[in-house]
Amino acid sequence: PVDRRQRQMCIRDRILLLSSNEQNYEKGDYKHFMAKEIDEQPNTVKNCVNEYIDKINKDINIFNFPFKEKEINSITLIGCGTAYHSCLIAKYWFEQLTSFDVNIDIASEFRYRKNKFKKDCLYVFVSQSGETADTYAALDLCNKNKMKTCSVVNVIESSIARDSKFVLPIHCGPE
């Protein structure tokens, strides 16, 4: 058994500072936060897209991508709830703009099926919070099978971000 002093030595506290910008936490003149978030969506999307676009070279910038493009022939997008709906839209755009085969899976189903993991597939996990339990379990399953994993999350300190081999933060601000 581990005594209390040993247990305390194993735990490391880490303080994360949130944005001090009150605009992120106040609803201002809006009746509801949801109305505020809907109104802010165009700027939020623009900021996210601009993070990854090189306007001068008219190209996409994804720095430090750990996989060789030639090693990837397909993409599987995995999420739950509204993140799953984001995967549906992403599938459409990937198919329009790339030659990749794209599949979508609901995380809660993915983890219970008998999956045929493919070494040439990039498994992309989508989660706003980065803490969705079913999505995390699906990521863990892929990691145990040594698959190529990537996450699209808003919280870069999240469990899903930490355990993915590559992270694409969306920088949408606090929930």
Label every PLM stretch briefly.
Residues 1-11:
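Single conserved hydrophobic/aromatic residue that forms the stacking wall/gate
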Residues 14-18:
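Flexible, low-complexity linker/loop segments at domain and module junctions
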Residues 19-54:
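Helix-enriched interaction subdomains in cytosolic or periplasmic regions
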Residues 48, 56, 100-102:
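Short coil-to-helix leader/linker segments, especially the first N-terminal amphipathic alpha-helix
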Residues 54-71:
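A short, well-structured juxtamembrane/interface segment
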Residues 70-175:
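Glycine-rich phosphate-binding loops that contact phosphosugars or nucleotide phosphates
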